[in-house]
Amino acid sequence: MEKIEKIIEFEIARINSHLPRARRSLKELLEMKEAKVTLRDGSEHYFKREELKLLANLLDEDEISKLKLPIVIEISTLERDKIMIRGRVEVKVIKKVLGLEEGYLEENVLKLPRYYLAEIRRKLPTTTVHAFIVEW
């Protein structure tokens, strides 16, 4: 069984090679001439300036410094019908973009039905990425 688990973990790591090595703050990206991050596979991911400005308009100055991009949308092997977003500011942004602010509570983790993934990626194509998470 251990060999199978190692193979699965290797494949998941390969599938997730599009994830950033490190995320940058929205503030830092807005100050860059070419807003980009380096991915695990060595390539670069570029952010659309208008998308960065959209996010900045949703947040106060302190939150602009705290928001790390791209926002990672987690897809778990256990809860395949759900997606998860982590981080207080990240959760706030996703809720605002989806119009889920009614009765807004500050949360550090947001679980949503998986069908929201397409809507989030359509509205924020360069500032979000999805990651496959292995859970046993």
Curated annotation (Swiss-Prot):
Alphabetized NCBIfam families for the sequence: PRK04115.1 (NF003153)
Pfam families in the cross-refs: DUF61 (PF01886)
Cystine residue pairs: none
Record-given protein name: UPF0216 protein PH0358
Protein source organism: Pyrococcus horikoshii (strain ATCC 700860 / DSM 12428 / JCM 9974 / NBRC 100139 / OT-3)
Organism superkingdom: Archaea
Lineage: Archaea, Methanobacteriati, Methanobacteriota, Thermococci, Thermococcales
Protein family: Belongs to the UPF0216 family.
